[in-house]
């Protein structure tokens, strides 16, 4: 798992973001949904920057129409609590 922390400093405010690799388990309710239909951005406030396929192939900046499959790993960027919440849904 990527445990990179990115600190973005804006006027008097510091925002700590986490980038992590989240595995899609066999029972995840996200399987078969497109990224758009999964509403990850709206429900979790996260950005999916890439998808790592079982084969190891990386899809950077996946399209909204990308369909999530079992075995995929979503590379998510956002606040730690939000990443943790999505991780639970990914596992199913």
Predicted segments, located by residue:
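Anionic-ligand-binding alpha/beta catalytic cores of soluble enzymes and soluble regulatory domains
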Residues: 1-19, 23
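Cytosolic Rossmann-like ligand/nucleotide-binding regulatory domains
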Residues: 21, 25-92
């Amino acid at each position: 798992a990527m445990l990179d922390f990115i600190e973005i400093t804006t006027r008097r405010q510091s925002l700590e973001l986490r980038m992590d690799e989240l595995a899609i388990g066999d029972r995840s309710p996200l399987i078969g949904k497109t990224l758009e239909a999964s509403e990850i951005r709206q429900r979790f406030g996260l950005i999916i920057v890439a998808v790592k396929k079982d084969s190891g192939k990386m899809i950077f900046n996946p399209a909204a129409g990308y369909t999530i499959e079992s075995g995929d790993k979503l590379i998510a960027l956002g606040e730690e609590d939000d990443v943790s919440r999505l991780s639970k849904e990914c596992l199913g």
